[in-house]
Amino acid sequence: RYGTLALDTGESLDSAEATLATATIAYSLRDDVEAIQWMHGHVQETGELPLLEAETVVRSLAIAMHSQSEIILPLLQLKEFDQYTTTHSTNVSVLAMAIGEYLGFAGRELRVLGVSGLLHDLGKVKIPREILVKPGGFTDEEFAIMKAHPKEGAKLILDRDVRLEVPAVVAYEHHIMLNGGGYPAFHFARDTHYASRLVHVCDVYDALCTNRPYRAAWTSAKALDYLEEKTGTDFDPVFSLPFIKMMKERSVQRLSLEDPEVKPSSPSPPGGEGDRG
């Protein structure tokens, strides 16, 4: 169903020890994915967020990142379009913790970034599936429904625990650009939370690198070029420039959750610019 991306320092992961380690990560990720799928289903059915499961997944992802001598970023590869919210949420959580650690965050701050990344799209459980997987453009009515997911996500998170203020704010703000564009629109100009600006970078990068019903995946290089081009308007340079540097410092390897053999990645076909949600 899925694949992963492991980012290392350029050395080949061809030893038996490395293969065993990456296979262990793959099996762990399968458990994490199943937990997230269950969590989304539980929220959809009951309206209640199982916080313990969310925190457990974030801790598991953090452990997977540090399971070898170099930091590994286990990013899931989408196979079926209706799995997008699950795989994307996992990837954004990993990327948010990775750039946070790269910038010197630690401990609770990193866990908050991980939980914020994991829950940033939680409001999509309220969006009809036919809209989420629709090929082609949205109608005005469909886009209005899609644009409600930040508010829905923030409400679901705050209803669970008011102490989840940062993840709730990130869920609300993650589609707002540095220049104030995006959605939901503010009634007056103000800065977004720093965690929202950090997650926004991770969110757009992973969305661009993922096949969607309405466009093919971009290569990592093309997505990073887009982040650089939009830095200062869409993206905060405090986070986008270190993110670009971090991703360029590491080479990409692919491995399948069904088959732990490490395989070189192949370029993805480019698509149109930007992402709709």
For each feature predicted by the language model, list its residue ranges.
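Glycine-biased, low-complexity coil/linker segments
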Residues: G272-G274
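Short alpha-helical scaffolding segments that buttress acidic/His motifs in well-ordered protein cores
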Residues: I36, V58-A62, I72-L76, A96, ...
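Histidine/acidic-rich helix-loop-helix segments that form or flank divalent-metal centers
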Residues: G117, I157-R160, E165-H200, Y214-P264
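An active-site-proximal "capping" alpha-helix that borders the catalytic cofactor pocket
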Residues: N91-I99, I145-L158, T219-G232
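Divalent metal-dependent catalytic cores for phosphoryl transfer on phosphate-bearing substrates
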Residues: P74-E80, H88, G104-V170
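Alpha-helical phosphate/pyrophosphate-handling elements in metalloenzyme active cores
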Residues: D82-L113, F186-D191
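All-alpha helical catalytic cores of prenyl diphosphate-utilizing isoprenoid enzymes
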Residues: L61-H66, Q83-N91, L122
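Non-catalytic interface/linker regions that flank or bridge core catalytic/transmembrane domains
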Residues: R1-K79, S265
